[in-house]
Curated annotation (Swiss-Prot):
It comes from Roseiflexus sp. (strain RS-1). F-type ATPases have 2 components, F(1) - the catalytic core - and F(0) - the membrane proton channel. F(1) has five subunits: alpha(3), beta(3), gamma(1), delta(1), epsilon(1). F(0) has four main subunits: a(1), b(2) and c(10-14). The alpha and beta chains form an alternating ring which encloses part of the gamma chain. F(1) is attached to F(0) by a central stalk formed by the gamma and epsilon chains, while a peripheral stalk is formed by the delta and b chains. Belongs to the ATPase B chain family. It is found in: Cell membrane. HAMAP family: ATP_synth_b_bprime. Keywords: ATP synthesis, Cell membrane, CF(0), Hydrogen ion transport, Ion transport, Membrane, Transmembrane, Transmembrane helix, Transport. GO terms for molecular function: proton-transporting ATP synthase activity, rotational mechanism; proton-transporting ATPase activity, rotational mechanism. The lineage of its organism: Bacteria, Bacillati, Chloroflexota, Chloroflexia, Chloroflexales. GO terms for cellular component: plasma membrane; proton-transporting ATP synthase complex. This is ATP synthase subunit b. PANTHER family: ATP SYNTHASE SUBUNIT B, ATP SYNTHASE SUBUNIT B', CHLOROPLASTIC.
Length: 163
């Protein structure tokens, strides 16, 4: 190979140098860079997984929040409906009580009017009896006896039938 201009000693030295440089580059440059790239890829994958977990947790939290909000709205609507029903019942009770009070006042007034009417009728009967006695005394000229009291009472009873 010397005819071709190849120097075996130099070729072997260069081959050893190339192998040594490849070994040096592989050991000190390629593997650390490859390890660094692998670590970075791992961190990126972990970050993506963490982001996905956070996204799922956020979706779950939103779903829970929406469920709680819907439940709270239903409870609020139920409480409002109960309050409205109680208010209607109280209003009906107040109106019924007012009607009962009005009826009692009316019946008391009617009873009082009836008592007043009876009292006035009694006074009228007494006054009429006095007038009858006075008229009879003047007509007869003397005071009526007790046996005539019965006649007066009967006359008044007859007058009471017409009232």
């Amino acid at each position: 190979m010397e005819k071709l201009g190849i120097n075996w000693g130099l070729l072997i030295a260069q081959l050893i140098n190339v192998i040594f440089v490849v070994w040096l580059l592989t050991t000190f440059l390629y593997r650390p860079i490859l390890n660094m790239l692998n670590q970075r890829t791992s961190r990126i994958q972990e970050g993506l997984q963490d982001a996905e977990k956070v996204k799922e947790q956020l979706a779950n939290a939103k779903r829970d929040y929406d469920a709680e909000l819907a439940k709270a709205r239903q409870e609020a609507a139920a409480i409002l409906a109960q309050a409205q029903e109680r208010a209607r019942a109280q209003a009906a009770e107040i109106i019924a009580q007012a009607h009962r009070d009005a009826e009692k006042i009316k019946s008391d007034a009617l009873a009082q009017a009836e008592q007043e009417r009876l009292r006035m009728l009694g006074e009228l009967k007494d006054r009429m009896a006095e007038l009858v006695v006075l008229t009879a005394e003047r007509v007869l000229g003397e005071e009526l006896k007790t046996n005539h009291d019965r006649l007066i009472e009967e006359s008044l009873a007859e007058l009471g039938k017409y009232n």
